[in-house]
Regions:
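Short, acidic, metal-binding catalytic loop of nucleotide-sugar glycosyltransferases
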Residues: 11-21
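Short beta-strand/loop segment that forms part of the nucleotide-sugar
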Residues: 21-31, 56-60
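Active-site-proximal specificity loops/subdomain of glycosyltransferases
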Residues: 41-109
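Short aromatic/hydrophobic "clamp" motif used to bind/position activated sugar donors
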Residues: 115
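Conserved catalytic core of nucleotide-sugar-dependent glycosyltransferases
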Residues: 125-222
Length: 315
């Protein structure tokens, strides 16, 4: 529901790495507010040419709920789980289409070796695509490259950091499972499936075949919302179990807050450059529900890229 922010993000990406992108996949979560019409507008497609813009609308609004895809039952869904919750895989009130899961439409349809995944609130200032591609070229076992984190949700944040993880440090024998702040340090988080560690998918790149392999072997999707984990966190743990590598080419000392400034990353991109996470437009993430400044972004598109946003479609 923020087409202006998404298009501005894509314009900044095109400016710094346009020749490295072939196609863009946009999954609209049933916005029903004119966003799809904007993405398909002739002026938008002409601006981004020769990129191919692939736009899809979900079969139903998923928001941050879990999609139960028949045939894909992850390990915590044991017989005890299925005794009382088996109906979730057939209930028509529950989403079941795998392409309604974040990023899965692109992962299932791209013919490229690597897929760049981004949020709609990122401002690119330097070519991070080449940085990630070099990381994959240097390590054939690499499955994902990007911004490591979610430290603000982990009780190990005081003794751990992305930089330490990338140097080989592990905060417990249970890693990448992580106890929450209310649990004792020696708690086996496998009992609760708590997961903080991940590669933050607001800007990351995956090896498509390795990503698909983890999905098939572990029956979990990269972008699904599994028990006690945010997007990509459950998949990240299963990727580690599969023996694949990960990398943050720009690891920070610490990430005590979701919006902590990270000079290492900001040389290449600025996440939440509008001053708030994108989801805060709809939900209170600790700072109240914030106002989406559509006009500011429209003005930036005109000032920085000379693009006249299709005003007739706003509203």
């Amino acid at each position: 529901k923020k087409p202006e922010s998404l298009l501005y993000t894509l314009m900044t990406l095109k400016k710094v790495a346009g020749d490295l992108i072939d196609a863009v996949y946009i999954n609209d979560d049933c916005s029903n507010d004119g966003s799809v019409e904007i993405y398909n507008d002739r002026r938008v497609r002409e601006y981004f040419s020769p990129w191919k813009l692939n736009v899809r609308v979900n079969t139903r609004n998923v928001h941050i709920s879990q999609v139960y895809v028949p045939g894909y039952r992850v390990d915590y869904m044991d017989w005890k789980f299925m005794l009382t919750k088996w109906h979730r895989f057939i209930d028509p009130r529950v989403p079941h289409n795998r392409h309604d899961i974040r990023y899965q439409y692109a992962l299932d349809n791209t013919d490229k070796k690597y897929l760049l995944i981004i949020h709609d609130d990122v401002k690119f200032v330097k070519d991070v695509v080449s940085l990630y591609l070099k990381a994959f070229a240097d390590n054939p076992n690499l499955a994902v490259a990007g911004d490591f984190g979610q430290c603000w949700r982990c009780r190990f944040a005081a003794v751990c950091s992305p930089k330490k993880i990338m140097s080989g440090f592990r905060p417990s024998r249970w890693w990448p499972l992580t106890p929450t702040s209310g649990e004792p340090a020696d708690f086996n988080p496998a009992n609760g499936y708590t997961r903080a560690c991940r590669i933050n998918e607001w800007c990351c790149m995956v090896d498509v075949e390795k990503c698909r392999d983890v999905t098939e072997r572990k029956r979990c999707f990269l972008g699904n919302m599994y028990k006690y984990s945010d997007t990509t966190a459950f998949w990240f743990g299963k990727m580690v179990e599969c023996g694949y590598d990960f990398i943050d080419p720009l690891p920070s000392e610490a990430l005590p807050k979701q919006l902590a400034r990270c000079p290492e990353h900001e040389e290449y991109y600025i996440h939440a450059w509008q001053g708030h996470p994108g989801h805060s437009v709809w939900a209170d993430q600790g700072m109240g529900i914030v106002k989406y400044n559509r006009d500011e972004i429209v003005d930036l598109m005109k000032a920085e890229f000379g693009f006249d946003f299709p005003q007739k479609l706003i509203g």
